[in-house]
Amino acid sequence: MTRVYVGNLDPRVTERELEDEFKAFGVLRNVWVARRPPGYAFLEFDDERDALDAISALDRKNGWRVELSHKDKGGRGGGGGRRGGIEDSKCYECGELGHFARECRRGRGSVRRRSPSPRRRRSPDYGYARRSISPRGRRSPPRRRSVTPPRRGRSYSRSPPYRGSRRDSPRRRDSPYGRRSPYANGV
């Protein structure tokens, strides 16, 4: 089995979408998409040649970084240190050894600093506002509606209301009430 790393993924990408994209190159044994933090995935191909074909075809497509996973070369242990083999680890952003992509100073155009509490700052739906809940854990009471009923009738438009075709109207145009005043025409 050959493991492939896919980086720079949209946080909303699903395992099914990746499977559909990569299965054209060969038999997939496993697809795993990271959720915390999002943005990368690992796929396992049955045959190394299929994995290499997928890498050559899909690397840099859609902005993705697709390459062989380095976990196949010796696993996690053996390197010592606090992270186990950090000296042998290759950064997926810049390609250099000795640090991870989240610590890369050259990746994505700027230095990325970790805040002390990233979970508090980031909403679970990645940027969309969430509704606040009152301190007691309940939602605040619904807003009261206005006591005055909504106005019905003529709008505030300056144009007269639509009355249909003029041919169908029995009213005369010279009087706003549809009949003549007895005082019109000097009577």
Swiss-Prot record:
Disordered: region residues: 68-89, 105-187
Residues modified as Phosphoserine: 123, 132, 134, 140, 146, 159, 181
Organ and tissue specificity: Expressed in roots, leaves, flowers and siliques.
SMART domains associated with the record: RRM, ZnF_C2HC
Post-translational modification as stated in the protein's UniProt record: Extensively phosphorylated on serine residues in the RS domain. Phosphorylated by AFC2.
Main localization, broad class: nucleus
One Pfam family linked to the record: RRM_1
Zinc finger residue ranges, CCHC-type: 89-106
Location relative to the cell: Nucleus speckle
Stretches with biased composition (Basic and acidic residues): 165-177
UniProt domain RRM: residue ranges: 2-73
Gene3D superfamilies: 3.30.70.330, Zinc finger, CCHC-type
Entry GO terms, CC: nuclear speck; spliceosomal complex
InterPro entries, per database record: Nucleotide-bd_a/b_plait_sf (IPR012677), RBD_domain_sf (IPR035979), RRM_dom (IPR000504), SRSF (IPR050907), Znf_CCHC (IPR001878), Znf_CCHC_sf (IPR036875)
Compositional bias annotation for Low complexity: 178-187
Complex and partners: Component of the spliceosome. Interacts with SNRNP35, AFC2, CYP59, RS2Z33 and RNU1. Interacts with MOS14.
Family statement drawn from the similarity comment of this UniProt entry: Belongs to the splicing factor SR family. RSZ subfamily.
UniProt cross-references to PANTHER family, sorted A to Z: SERINE/ARGININE RICH SPLICING FACTOR
Protein role: Probably involved in intron recognition and spliceosome assembly.
Protein's UniProt name: Serine/arginine-rich splicing factor RSZ21
Source organism of the structure: Arabidopsis thaliana (Mouse-ear cress)
